């Protein structure tokens, strides 16, 4: 679950009670993202952050050791079907390097415009998880196994 809400703190308990196993949020949505990460972690749920395309990772790198997932947004959040922003691949690569150099355990996910033309680029640069909703649903076939395998 990725959340882009103001006042996220007031909803965390509800998401935990609903059975979430990971809660990922945009750190710029709150003045104290460390507190949100602690609230999520204290509930024994995995915590993650989603990085908006306009956010410089150097401004939030103090959060990386505290989370289990980082989502690189490769479109501007808001609606599906947007084009993949290739300039965000550098963030994927940088996050992978930071993870390796610091022995961090977060997974890197990519969300936004991922398809068969850019999935390999994302994986080759360190992505562990690819969100492919729009691509998957835009294919004119019902064999999701083949579609998903085309992304491997």
Predicted regions, residues:
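Active-site phosphate/pyrophosphate- and oxyanion-stabilizing loops and adjacent acidic/basic residues
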Residues: 93, 120, 149
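Conserved active-site loop/cleft motifs that coordinate metal ions or position small ligands
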Residues: 107-109, 130-133
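Expand to "…catalyze enediolate/carbanion chemistry for C-C bond making/breaking, isomerization
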Residues: 31, 35, 103, 115, ...
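Conserved anion-binding
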Residues: 10-11, 20-107
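Catalytic cores of alpha/beta
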Residues: 9-17, 55-67, 112-130
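C-terminal helical cap(s) of enzyme catalytic domains, especially alpha/beta-barrels
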Residues: 40, 123, 135-152
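Active-site beta-loop-alpha junctions enriched in small/polar residues
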Residues: 2-6, 28, 52-54, 75, ...
